[in-house]
A protein has these predicted regions:
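A Zn2+-metalloprotease active-site environment signal
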Residues: 1-140
Length: 140
């Protein structure tokens, strides 16, 4: 999905195409279904660990599970960025404009943004590098 806040900051149709291509990438990659399955699995493991163990150990297991789920989320975001680049190129849009979207997201997050390791989304700078790699990959 796209929020009005992001939509209002987009500078051109190519950037909108990039956001929509990214979101279609989530659908094609079945990321929602995979994330729900992974969260269910880690929740089951944490519940099993929590039985008969002190609360602090259970909290530690929950924190580890949460970190693992965020790592999977970051991978999904990078895969969707990659697919978004491909879809943009296939449709005749300028894929470099997806980099502009990442700059908008970086600016919106400000200097106190959540560290990547604690976020479900990769840092915009890392995403920019991966987008550049995807552009080169699909130009060949």
């Amino acid at each position: 999905f796209i929020t009005y806040a992001l939509f209002s900051k987009l500078e051109n149709e190519d950037q909108l195409a990039g956001v929509l291509g990214h979101e279609i990438g989530h659908v094609i990659g079945r990321h929602s279904a995979e994330r729900m399955a992974k969260q269910g699995l880690t929740q089951s493991i944490v519940s099993g660990v929590a039985v008969g163990i002190d609360p602090s150990t259970a909290q530690g297991a929950a924190a580890i599970a949460n970190t693992l789920n965020m790592k999977y989320g970051r991978g999904d975001e990078l895969e969707s960025d990659d697919l978004g680049v491909k879809f943009m190129m296939d449709a005749g849009y300028n894929p470099a404009e997806l980099i502009g979207v990442m700059k908008i997201l970086k600016e919106a997050a400000g200097p106190n943004r959540t560290p990547e390791r604690l976020s479900s989304h990769p840092d915009p700078e890392n995403r920019i590098e991966k987008i550049k790699e995807a552009i080169e990959k699909y130009r060949k």
